[in-house]
């Protein structure tokens, strides 16, 4: 069977199914420019969707010493290490949207030696 013929076991819900989760999903609309199908699928279980969204909001919050850009770069590298193409696509998109310098995106795999990365970024 070709991968294109595989259907999901659970279909994503329409974006406006649950007003509370739809409100929380605005985080992804701001971060990625869209709400991922994984979140729309989680909406079948609103408590799970809410917990997932709140976790993402807490981790990626724009406060503290770690910049939003660096958080997204770390997420991208982590996604690559685990082999999750779905997460790779979302984290690199978020890094772009959070104004990560193109030089860093182009040289992410040389972060330990490339001059565009600071010592703090190398440690992260």
Walk through the language-model features, giving the residues of each.
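Iron-sulfur (Fe-S) cluster-binding segments and ferredoxin-like electron-carrier domains
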Residues: 49, 88-107
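Immediate flanking context of iron-sulfur cluster ligation sites
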Residues: 32, 64-81
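Mobile cap/lid helix-loop segments that border enzyme active or cofactor-binding sites
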Residues: 2-65
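Short Fe-S-cluster ligation motifs
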Residues: 110-124
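Short, thiol/selenol-centered motifs that function as redox-active sites or metal-ligating centers
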Residues: 74-94
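Short linear capping/connector segments at secondary-structure termini
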Residues: 72, 107-112
């Amino acid at each position: 069977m070709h991968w294109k013929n595989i259907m999901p076991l659970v279909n994503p819900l329409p974006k406006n199914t649950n007003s509370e989760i739809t409100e929380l999903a605005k985080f992804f609309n701001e971060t990625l420019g869209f709400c991922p199908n994984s979140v729309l699928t989680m909406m079948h279980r609103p408590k799970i969707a809410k917990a997932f969204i709140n976790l993402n909001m807490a981790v990626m919050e724009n406060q503290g010493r770690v910049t939003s850009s660096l958080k997204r770069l770390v997420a991208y590298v982590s996604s690559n290490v685990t082999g999750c193409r779905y997460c790779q696509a979302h984290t690199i998109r978020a890094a772009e949207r959070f104004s990560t310098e193109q030089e860093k995106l182009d040289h992410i795999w040389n972060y330990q030696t490339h001059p565009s990365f600071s010592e703090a970024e190398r440690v992260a």
